[in-house]
Swiss-Prot record:
Matching Gene3D superfamilies: 3.30.300.20
GO cellular component: cytosol
HAMAP family: RbfA (MF_00003)
Function: One of several proteins that assist in the late maturation steps of the functional core of the 30S ribosomal subunit. Associates with free 30S ribosomal subunits (but not with 30S subunits that are part of 70S ribosomes or polysomes). Required for efficient processing of 16S rRNA. May interact with the 5'-terminal helix region of 16S rRNA.
UniProt family annotation: Belongs to the RbfA family.
Name of this protein: Ribosome-binding factor A
Domain of life: Bacteria
PANTHER family for the chain: RIBOSOME-BINDING FACTOR A, CHLOROPLASTIC-RELATED
Keywords noted in UniProt: Cytoplasm, Ribosome biogenesis
Coiled-coil ranges per UniProt: none
GO molecular function, one term: ribosomal small subunit binding
GO annotation terms (biological process): maturation of SSU-rRNA
Amino acid sequence: MPSYRQARLAEFLRDEIAAIIQRELRDPRLGFVSVTRVEMSPDLRHAKVFVSIYGSHEEQEAALEALQGAAGFIRRLIAPHLHTRHIPELHFKLDRSLEHAEQVARLLRQIQQERQRDESAVESTPESE
């Protein structure tokens, strides 16, 4: 379980990185990127930045590549606002939790439709006496 300091720093980084991506980075590959969460290492030297990217697999890979290329620039913009000994290294990861949630919802809808079909089939069959 992350410490209070890790959680606070992760939340701060999530907000700052999202703002920097939106306002400072002019890369067209970053059009539909959202920072979903940040996980800090116990020593606060590394930050896994999870992002959700709307688009095809190729567009997602291109956006991740652009983010990793801009990691040094983002660190420099964040540095004056951090009161830590070290500025964390940023590691961008694709957050697939939204895709997973969508897949679960789709499966649940499919099960519900199958149940409704089964119930209507049972109701429409004549009862034997």
